[in-house]
């Protein structure tokens, strides 16, 4: 039986028209397409008309043609190959359905000339209705590829409609990102300054200063920050949100049963609070059997294990109630199932339930790795992470949990697959819950700074992503993958990228002052990043005419906002 390492059975696509530069394709940046997950009776027609590859099979319900996954694993149809070019990004889309079975995973796989399989995206397909499958590939070398459908069911029969592969240069992709950023991260604000009789105040001057950005690019910290004043100064001058790498974890705070020690975590939290830095909790429990306190796996009695686990949840969540922005309640509970094996299938869901009762206002994450990174293994795919969150929220008493998805983002030292990453974020975002990238890093490699910038911009340009935390720091911090500064706190190339993005994603302090006129043009309108602002209105000729107020610019207020200021004079 032919398979690849993950055990999925493959079915090769017969490429009917290999280089047709027209046809229907899905725009990976379209807001209407990005979160589309419903199953439809007939695939909708897209306004996009340019695709490198375009074909359909089995569009009609009564057709006998479909992609059949042969039980013997043999490939029964030869293919003409598609030529891909290094430096381009290829976005794949197809509407798929099952002719037999229901709710099975269907994915797209690219096989390169050297026999490597690149997982390109996946969905849960259904019978008798169509689901949109999206993904793609960013080739690290030029060459030809074969395109496959994959399924976890060897008997699957897959119908495909409007299969498309669309090519973007990196410049075109970034232009799309920038256009989307203008829509999802900014709003245009128009100021109207009038007297009480509603006549305009000509010559008024409006000054604007951002006090808090809506989107936060943060950085993890560890205990070494308590030992280095330079590390503390470096951190506080840059970041407004953090998480602690190990200091809140169970194996750190209770190394011996019954002997809790929160000294390091408390001290780090105090530093953060003194410097206006928000803290994201990591982690209450960890479902990996190898990541427990050394004494926990020695407990054989399930009742005893339940007691110490509940004590841990109560202890850490009560201690930090109201002090954190979020919690990884059961870390990596798609990859691992230690507590489920020991305490029952609903262990994770019940722990989220208890956590919700202890701190109902904190955001609670399902936090996983290899979800957006496009690794070979397929344990915590976007579909499975989405299903885990749905399972937790469906547990009795959990419907009002403030849920969120944590995509860790431990990328390999190679060109990231941005097309796959965007499709993965689409799948996760279809839940309607916020997504955070929580542990972004990458081993040292040539072009690390380029790849990290591409990853962070991809996340920032996706509407479902609400924040990012990188696992990085200066040399003294011990972060040996993403090292942002040397021992003298001089930036590395990757450090320069982070500083550039911090400046770009926080409203510049050099916002031009607005001078009110009686014209009908947009001189009084300014494009502002979402966030909190202090606004001052004054007049150069009327010294007593001055007023200040706070303003929050939000996505919910729309693309254009009007702020009316009435002057008593």
From Swiss-Prot:
The active site is at 332 (proton donor), 439 (nucleophile). GO terms for biological process: xylan catabolic process. Residues 1-25 form the signal peptide. One of its GO terms (molecular function) is endo-1,4-beta-xylanase activity. InterPro entries: GH10 (IPR044846), GH10_dom (IPR001000), Glycoside_hydrolase_SF (IPR017853). Pathway: Glycan degradation; xylan degradation. Residues 209-500 form the GH10 domain. It comes from the Eukaryota. Binds to and hydrolyzes insoluble and soluble xylan substrates. Belongs to the glycosyl hydrolase 10 (cellulase F) family. This is Endo-1,4-beta-xylanase 5. It comes from Arabidopsis thaliana (Mouse-ear cress).
